[in-house]
Amino acid sequence: MNTQTTPSPQFYLTAPAACPYLPHEMERKVFTHLVGPRAAEMNDILTQGGFRRSQNIAYRPACESCRACVSVRILAQEFEPTKSMKRVLAANSDVIATEFAAQPSSEQYSLFRRYLDFRHQQGGMSDMTVLDYAIMVEDTHVNTRIIEYRRREEGSGLEQRPKGELLAAALTDTMSDGLSMVYSYFNPALEQRSLGTFMILDHVRRTKALGLPHVYLGYWVQGSRKMDYKTRFQPQEHLTPRGWERFDPSSMPESTHD
């Protein structure tokens, strides 16, 4: 009798490298490949267990002396925007969001390059080429979409890609319990629009419409100013050694509150 078994995923550990968020710290990651017929199922399980996806890799911090990286997810069905978030929604009332298959475009890369050059000149992604970007978008074995955010132009109708300037884009995985924001970027010259906040609010709206509970934001690092924005979206849960627990925002410094 022939019995077929599904191979278990193999996990690997990276060598130590400088932490991009906390000075004087070293980071290590544990990772596995998301390929094959069970890739989407594994992505769900691993994301719910604190992993993040990058291309066909799922990874999680495995640092020897630091536990600062904390997985964060918004409780979408309970979420209500704050006054400042309502102002962000109003400021972007002229924006059309359209969902597409995970396929790159030269227009996307041009905006992505502009974002990196302004926001992440020293980061690990700073030298990404157009081919690197295409791989980031296309190399997925799960249910991945790219959402484009464009300024509405008169005459925009039912065409496949609405007219208007591309302001922002988000690479997003649809999972059994919600949406996971894999990577997002925007025009850094339009600071008054708070496009990063707007994209998160749009993902909460989409998750609510799907009747699903969670929007996964990746890792929050207390002490890293570039991560502070994630705690403004309440209520939310943080993954602790005891599992997912509701986060108390009153424990944060005032600067991170609305």
Swiss-Prot record:
Major place of residence: cytoplasm
Source organism superkingdom: Bacteria
Swiss-Prot/TrEMBL catalytic activity: N-terminal L-glutamyl-[protein] + L-leucyl-tRNA(Leu) = N-terminal L-leucyl-L-glutamyl-[protein] + tRNA(Leu) + H(+); N-terminal L-aspartyl-[protein] + L-leucyl-tRNA(Leu) = N-terminal L-leucyl-L-aspartyl-[protein] + tRNA(Leu) + H(+)
A single GO BP: ubiquitin-dependent protein catabolic process via the N-end rule pathway
InterPro entries: Acyl_CoA_acyltransferase (IPR016181), Asp_Glu_LeuTrfase (IPR017138), N-end_Aminoacyl_Trfase (IPR030700), N-end_Aminoacyl_Trfase_C (IPR007472), N-end_Aminoacyl_Trfase_N (IPR007471)
GO molecular function terms listed in the Swiss-Prot or TrEMBL record: arginyl-tRNA--protein transferase activity; leucyl-tRNA--protein transferase activity
Signal sequence region: none
EC code: 2.3.2.29
Function: Functions in the N-end rule pathway of protein degradation where it conjugates Leu from its aminoacyl-tRNA to the N-termini of proteins containing an N-terminal aspartate or glutamate.
Similarity comment: Belongs to the R-transferase family. Bpt subfamily.
Record protein name field: Aspartate/glutamate leucyltransferase
Gene field: bpt
